[in-house]
Amino acid sequence: MTLTPSPTDALHGWIILDKQEGLGSTQAVSAVKRAIRIAGLPKVKVGHGGTLDPLASGVLPVALGEATKLAGYALNSDKVYAFTLAFGAETDSLDREGSITAQSDKRPTREEVESVLSCFRGEIHQIPPVYSALKINGKRACDRVRAGETVTVKGRDITIHELTLDDFSPDQATFIAKVSKGTYIRSLARDIAHKLNCYGHVSYLRRLKSGPFTSEQAISLDKLMEMAQAGKLYQMLLPLTAGLDDIPALAVSSDQAKALRQGQKLIGINAESGLNMAMESQIPVALIEVTGQEARVLRGFNF
């Protein structure tokens, strides 16, 4: 198998969607599966690398085939968002689609907004929204709320690597934030408003980057379907290794590759400690963890 698939190969790699507002992440995955069928390509496993709220637009990495084994690493990566905090009303969902729960006539100045941002940079404790996909005793929090239950969501420590004010008007402020996994932008917006002694909600949310994947690499669903109908879906595919740009490649011999494919440890490896991508020529063999001079398989690939 080569790294560049032919028009009839099963797809193994990443398609980066520019998800539109109003579409759920699961719906987006279903659309990719439909595109694969339209293109007449072999059926493969498909999954996304990080839920994006229906309200939000932007970068949604979709893993195909063997790349689904790496989706968990995409979930753990940092994300970059642009979001608008509309002042005046807080909602139960913390976005524009929810019911108003609190209101205030107070509007902060630009200077006041900028003065509180330092409070949210670095590691902070955050309470996720009750309208979220977080599981509580096996059931999503949002489903429990809709069923009429009173829900308490536990707080968590997250990291805001960067937070800047991008635009401001008397009724709203737009920010750019680079955040760690597990961060809820809706909660961040709520907390910024509270720090300013007012109320607010997210009126706009766009993911600009997810791990190594950027908006420049993302395509719309319309473009995806167009390429599928033209039999050119493979041209939209990024290689499996594109999701691991911060993980070094480790060249292995054919004998070593065979051992790794059988799940065996390699002894006497000269490589950086930590995660490495074992490669036989141009073919991904396994994601391995190196400790000392020993390597063990974390994820093996069937190529």
Curated annotation (Swiss-Prot):
Molecular function as annotated in GO:
RNA binding; tRNA pseudouridine(55) synthase activity
Keyword terms, alphabetized: Isomerase, tRNA processing
The record's active-site residues are D53 (nucleophile)
UniProt xrefs under InterPro entries: PsdUridine_synth_cat_dom_sf, PsdUridine_synth_N, tRNA_psdUridine_synth_TruB, TruB_C
- Top-level EC class: isomerase
Q: Which reaction does it catalyse?
A: uridine(55) in tRNA = pseudouridine(55) in tRNA
Q: Tell me, which GO biological process terms does this entry list?
A: mRNA pseudouridine synthesis; tRNA pseudouridine synthesis
This protein's record includes keyword Coiled coil? no
SUPFAM superfamilies registered for this protein in UniProt: Pseudouridine synthase
What are the EC numbers?
5.4.99.25
Family in the record: Belongs to the pseudouridine synthase TruB family. Type 1 subfamily.
Question: Known HAMAP family for this protein?
Answer: TruB_bact (MF_01080)
Q: What does this chain do? A: Responsible for synthesis of pseudouridine from uracil-55 in the psi GC loop of transfer RNAs.
PANTHER family in UniProt: PSEUDOURIDYLATE SYNTHASE TRUB1, TRNA-PSEUDOURIDINE SYNTHASE
Write the protein's name. Answer: tRNA pseudouridine synthase B
Q: Which organism is it from?
A: Zymomonas mobilis subsp. mobilis (strain ATCC 31821 / ZM4 / CP4)
Q: What gene, per UniProt, encodes this protein?
A: truB
